[in-house]
Curated annotation (Swiss-Prot):
This is Orotate phosphoribosyltransferase. Gene3D superfamilies: 3.40.50.2020. Keywords: Glycosyltransferase, Magnesium, Pyrimidine biosynthesis, Transferase. The gene is pyrE. The keyword Ubl conjugation does not apply.
């Protein structure tokens, strides 16, 4: 089945099933935030697949602000997301460039924090994230983007683990929009395995 031809509702359901099957694991894990958890979500097997990225880009694009001229995110989780959205936007004849925020500055040359076709200073950029737990990674990306002279109003995430990210992001004056929360992912994984 071609996911491009599906409706938004069926695209969401299909993406949720892909995430539950390929991105979610139950066990004992240490998260990037340092927290221990029985639930692990690694979206890369989905975001690095053609169908997964098409579904995701289709669902994310309507949430990117109209005045946003770029999408950006912290490497590595956001790399396929920003590329997929830039391509989906181009297919709709919308200019939306992809930017990648490094975890530390490039060690040579320009020593850049941000890679990609940089927009004019003051431009609105939407930040993308695969999974949010505390919001730390997202806010690090926002900090570097803001220091570079750009404006961020919202963060789009695939999965919100519901462990404080929304509150921390809101405290920073930003809006968090997530396609799914951890409870939805856990339930779909249970449904698939039963």
């Amino acid at each position: 089945m071609n996911p491009i031809a599906q409706s938004k509702d069926s695209s969401r359901e299909k993406l949720l099933s892909l995430l539950a099957s390929n991105a979610y694991r139950h066990g004992t894990f240490t998260l990037s935030s340092g927290k221990k958890s029985n639930h692990y979500v690694n979206c890369k097997p989905v975001t690095l697949s053609g169908f997964g990225l098409v579904l995701l880009s289709d669902l994310f694009l309507p949430h990117v602000e109209e005045d946003s001229i770029a999408v950006a995110g912290l490497t590595l989780g956001a790399d396929p997301l920003v590329s997929g959205l830039a391509m989906a936007a181009a297919q709709q004849e919308r200019t939306l460039n992809a930017l990648i925020v490094r975890k530390e500055p490039k060690g040579h040359g320009t020593e850049a924090w941000i890679e990609g076709p940089l927009p004019p200073k003051g431009s609105v950029i939407t930040v993308l994230e695969d999974v949010v737990t505390t919001g730390g990674s997202s806010l690090k990306a926002v900090s570097q983007i803001s220091k570079a002279g750009y404006k961020v109003n919202r963060i789009l995430a695939i999965v919100d683990r519901q462990e404080g990210a929304a509150m921390e992001i809101q405290k920073s004056g930003l809006l968090l929009i997530s396609l799914f929360n951890l409870d939805e992912l856990v339930q779909r994984a249970k449904d698939i395995s039963s």
